Amino acid sequence: MSTSTDWPSLASLLARQPDFDPDAVPVAQARELLADWVTPRVQARSMPAQAEAVGRVLARDVIARLDLPPCDNAAMDGYALCHADLNPEGDTTLPVGGRTLAGDPPATLPPGQAWRIMTGAPMPAGADTVVMQEHVRRHADDSALQGASSQPDGGACPSETITLPAGQKPGQNVRRRGEDIRTGQTALPAGRILSPMDLGVAASQGIVDLPVFDPLKVGVFSTGNELVQSGQPLAAGQIHDSNRPTLLALARSRGFEAIDLGWLPDDPAILTKALASSIDQVDVLLTTGGAAGGDADLLWHVLSQPMHHQGMSLPTEAHAWKLKLRPGRPLVIGRISQTPVFGLPGNPVAALLSFLFVIDAALQKMAGITTPRPLPRIRARAGTAIRKRPGRQELLRVTLCYHESDDLPVALPAGSQSSAQLRSVAEADGIAVLPEDQGPVAQGDRLDVVPLHGLL
């Protein structure tokens, strides 16, 4: 849906990669190349800085209008004073001249006195230090202060004195004006995924509306004669389509607008027409199936031919990669006019993991995210030996067991590791990442695991 025309072909980017081999693409290289290739595809708009903005991507820098804190204030309940009035060798006794609460106007500290102050209250003029109330001895109750507020004229309260020990540090327990945010600085950078804390920062600046990007529109097709939508009867040789619901939900969980484009048979004419007509509805297209290069795998062939839609010729681009990844080896990358197309494997687990480990960074960049969120990782111990040969990255579905006697969880395979076994992902706690150069894993070896809780 973007109107941008300044987008180089993937072929031109690959031409600058002398070591690139489309039949043996490392996962990290694939992820970086795709993120470098795509451009932001979303439009900006203004929306209230309320809870609905959480998860949206900030379109422009938010520049601070106010210092935060707006003035020097107390970080603790206690007594404000001038550090120069203290005896460095022993106890100091000072009369208390008044009291300031949070929200009161600033007072003025008379020389040689202390000032009762509460957390968040503005520091009196002439005071530079706060002593915690737990560190002083009070020599009279504060009944004379009940109901009193800040006294800008420095009016004394002779009924109370305090004694405090030596060792107080100048400036202690004081929050300085602007130490959190300074007027004119970038309070929130563009390209940031807004969090509840970010809304708090905006509110502290008196900001009512925020510039945000529209969610990236991710369209999802399933392809394959063997697929039938859930709820429909199955004929011999058919299966229910699990990929499309999974990818739509995954796209939505990543903050994108997921658009269900339905199912397509293995028919080049139907596939071509559906792909060409969909680019007006979405920012990026995902398909599952038809990526492996078999006789019935048509996506690369369709994307290799020019398309036409509503009387217009649509330029296309197509690349077929074999990733050094298990599961998830085949990947088709293409473009119809200015709309990128990612052809994911047909096996359910391979499609899911290809989304997360290969194309997610590119989708985030298209959504306007300046620094894509990496997948979180934790360390775990292998609960059993794992057979592996160097040469490709392997992703294992694992359950995690926690023991008080061990500082790391134990990772055990979660059922079958077949790329068609979706249930094993549903039962898994995480994905163990075995690097490309990794050989056999011994029981007890440390592993990197991407936890799935909160991710799927």
Sequence positions of predicted segments:
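Helix-rich terminal scaffold detector
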Residues: 1-28, 210-344, 348-354
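Short, low-complexity N-terminal leaders and the immediately following helix N-cap/first helix
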Residues: 1-91, 116, 146, 151-153, ...
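Short, glycine/charged-enriched hinge/interface segments at domain edges or termini
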Residues: 7-22, 80-260, 265, 415-416, ...
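Conserved active-site and cofactor/substrate-binding residues in soluble primary-metabolism enzymes
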Residues: 22-29, 45-48, 52, 76, ...
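Flexible glycine/proline-rich
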Residues: 28-31, 46, 50-51, 60, ...
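Short, conserved secondary-structure segments in the cores of folded domains
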Residues: 58, 70-71, 105, 113, ...
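Solvent-exposed alpha-helices and their adjacent loops that cap or buttress functional pockets
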Residues: 72-74, 86-89, 106-110, 123-124, ...
